[in-house]
């Protein structure tokens, strides 16, 4: 059964009041991949009366007044993606398509959706229950932050939205604690993962440079952000406070990561794995095609990539599910209509982080003076892919499962650092769990750019390439590597993109196609460098391409077609046949006669 999204569903349940109303910028997909569904089901499971209003019309009160007011609180999220990232390209152009909207047309989610929905509530309900912000848009904008789309330092989204509370991170436990305290009229000020506004700073909390100071001086903004960045681990983080106008933002320490039992509980909830019928007339939701038959094995990431916001939202400690929980979910997928035997993805932010974590981090918290993976894999991490191998073997043996694909990205450096099970794991994945292509994200080839990204050098990538070719040939399969690249990252110049293009063609035998222009999203170190124009570690000036034309040009340099490469942009990896080389160039499409030069 879906979480109610219509008045008719509320009546059938016999409810006359709701405890919580959740607002989202996406169409409502009931799935463990969708935050509003997880939060809604978490509340339902302990007895709260919950409903969802997906993509309400902000020009009228028709949608927002559908259920009246909640007894406890309104929950507001922009959706699975920051609304400005979902609505705008890196060049600022409006996106026409939307994978999270029924019908696929990007016409339902407003820019700055969290602020728009909070204002919509206040417009139609003057004195109402608390407005609580959550989801990735609120999470990444919880303190003063650089906003790429307006090119200025903005206040916390809590301040701009005039909301009562903000829950950052994944919040499955925080939401229950908040609801219980509000029901009992209790004090919520001690709740982990909570931000709120106060008249005075909180004693014992670290005072950050104010919003006014951060706006006036890039050096103050850098000091503020680095202090925020150092206080993200739940075991070591201090509470933070920051003056914004006449009020203070109080930022409590992060919530603790979920235990394995809690992860199993969350993913064991009774999700329908479908789009709510209220969207039926609008058409399908493309995102469902991927997530319906996929499985989350873990969350969080300690990769430390400077451009990535996963750690700021999910945390840098990996929380993983038990093998039994994952196998149960896989067995359930076989009973769903439309399932044809293939699990489309088994993984998380990084597929091969399942099954191990740094014991020192789990006991004492993450290190503040080093990264787990950069510039090399830390000796304290001790990666072991044994549990991942065992899990994949279990999934292969399930009745009704033809293939369980590992479609999430793989970290070559992490895999190669596991001298016992790393290479056997790669062999198993290539033989059984690749659906034509394996995804990796080297992002660049030039050392000075990789250093700005917090990514390792190309040595592990080239070793991985050789192993991929070897195991592909052994398996007798035709499959290839898909590499993801970033253009216009801080520190990257046109010459670096030209060098990357040569590297991709000569060393990887592929024509780059999966290329994105760097988008400065809030709460990342790369965005800090984009704004200040300095390397935050050395203080030295960096080249930062900020013009739209220059950013587009960097991408064009990389994707320019190379002679000898045809449709698909790759030199295919195929097994030996009839004495011919297994490395063959896919031929270009034949030129139509009408395009040939006249004699």
Regions picked out by a protein language model, each given a short descriptive name:
Residues 35, 54-244, 252, 256, ...:
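Glycine-rich beta-alpha loop elements in corrinoid/cobalamin-binding modules
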Residues 82-91, 140-142, 172-177, 201-202, ...:
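Flexible glycine/acidic-rich beta-alpha junction loops that bind and position SAM and/or redox cofactors
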Residues 23-29, 282-309, 342:
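N-terminal pre-triad scaffold of radical SAM enzymes
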Residues 12, 20-24, 65-66, 191-194, ...:
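Flexible, glycine-rich loop/tail regions that form catalytic "lids" or insertion modules at the edges
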Residues 164, 266, 301, 326, ...:
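Conserved, mostly hydrophobic/aromatic
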Residues 59, 187-233, 246, 255-258, ...:
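Terminal amphipathic helices with adjacent charged low-complexity linkers/tails
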Residues 1-17, 27, 222-294:
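N-terminal [4Fe-4S]-dependent radical SAM core
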Residues 22-24, 38, 52-53, 57-58, ...:
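Conserved SAM/AdoMet-binding glycine-rich loop
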């Amino acid at each position: 059964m879906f979480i109610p999204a219509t008045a008719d569903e509320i009546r059938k349940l016999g409810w006359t009041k709701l405890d919580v109303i959740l607002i989202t910028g996406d169409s409502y997909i009931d799935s463990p991949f969708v935050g509003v569904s997880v939060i809604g089901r978490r509340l339902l499971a302990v007895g709260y009366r919950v409903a969802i209003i997906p993509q309400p019309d902000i020009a009228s009160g028709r949608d927002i007044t559908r259920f009246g007011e909640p007894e406890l609180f309104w929950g507001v999220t922009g959706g699975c993606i920051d609304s400005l990232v979902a609505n705008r390209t890196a060049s600022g152009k409006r996106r026409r398509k939307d994978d999270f909207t029924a019908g696929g047309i990007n016409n339902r989610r407003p820019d700055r959706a969290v602020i728009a929905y909070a204002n919509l509530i206040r417009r139609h309900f003057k004195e109402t229950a608390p407005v609580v912000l959550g989801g990735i848009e609120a999470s990444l904008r919880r303190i003063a932050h650089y906003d790429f789309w307006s090119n200025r330092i903005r206040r916390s989204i809590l301040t701009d939205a005039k909301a009562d509370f903000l829950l950052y991170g994944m919040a499955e436990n925080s939401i229950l604690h908040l609801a219980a305290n509000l029901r009992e009229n209790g004090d919520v000020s001690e709740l982990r993962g909570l931000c709120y506004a106060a008249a005075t700073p909180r004693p014992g909390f670290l005072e950050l440079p104010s919003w006014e100071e951060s706006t006036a001086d890039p050096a103050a903004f850098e000091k503020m952000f680095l202090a925020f960045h150092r206080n993200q681990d739940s075991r070591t983080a201090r509470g933070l406070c920051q003056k914004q106008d006449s009020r203070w933002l109080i930022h409590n320490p992060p919530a603790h990561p979920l235990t394995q039992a809690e992860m199993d509980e969350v993913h064991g909830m009774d999700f329908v794995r479908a789009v709510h019928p209220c969207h039926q007339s609008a058409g399908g939701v493309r995102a469902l095609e991927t997530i319906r038959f996929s499985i989350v094995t873990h969350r969080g990431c300690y990769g430390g990539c400077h451009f990535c916001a996963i750690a700021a939202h999910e945390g840098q400690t990996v929380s993983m599910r038990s093998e039994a929980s994952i196998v149960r979910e896989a067995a359930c997928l076989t009973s769903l209509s439309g399932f044809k035997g293939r699990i489309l993805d088994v993984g998380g932010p990084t597929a091969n982080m399942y099954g191990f974590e740094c014991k020192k981090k789990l006991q004492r918290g993450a290190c503040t003076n080093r990264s787990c993976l950069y510039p090399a894999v830390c000796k304290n991490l001790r990666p072991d892919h044994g549990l991942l191998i065992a899990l994949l073997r279990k999934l292969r043996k399930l009745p009704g499962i033809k293939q369980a694909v590992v479609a999430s990205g793989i970290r070559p450096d992490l895999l190669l650092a596991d001298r016992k099970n790393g290479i056997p794991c790669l062999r198993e994945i290539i033989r059984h769990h690749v659906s034509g292509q394996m995804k990796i994200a080297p992002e660049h080839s030039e050392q000075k750019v990789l250093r700005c990204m917090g990514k390792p050098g190309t040595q592990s990538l080239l070793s991985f390439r050789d192993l991929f070719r070897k195991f592909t040939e052994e398996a007798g399969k035709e499959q290839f590597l898909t590499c993801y690249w970033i253009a216009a990252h801080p520190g990257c110049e046109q010459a670096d993109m030209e060098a990357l293009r040569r590297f991709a063609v000569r060393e990887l035998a592929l024509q780059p196609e999966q290329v994105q222009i760097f988008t400065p999203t809030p709460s990342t170190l790369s965005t800090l460098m984009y704004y200040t124009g300095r390397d935050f570690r050395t203080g030295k000036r960096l080249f930062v391409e900020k013009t739209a034309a220059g950013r587009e040009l960097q991408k064009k340099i990389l994707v320019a077609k190379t002679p000898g490469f045809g449709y698909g942009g790759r030199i295919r990896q195929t097994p030996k046949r009839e004495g011919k080389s297994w490395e063959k160039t896919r031929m270009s499409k034949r030129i139509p006669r009408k395009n040939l030069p006249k004699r």
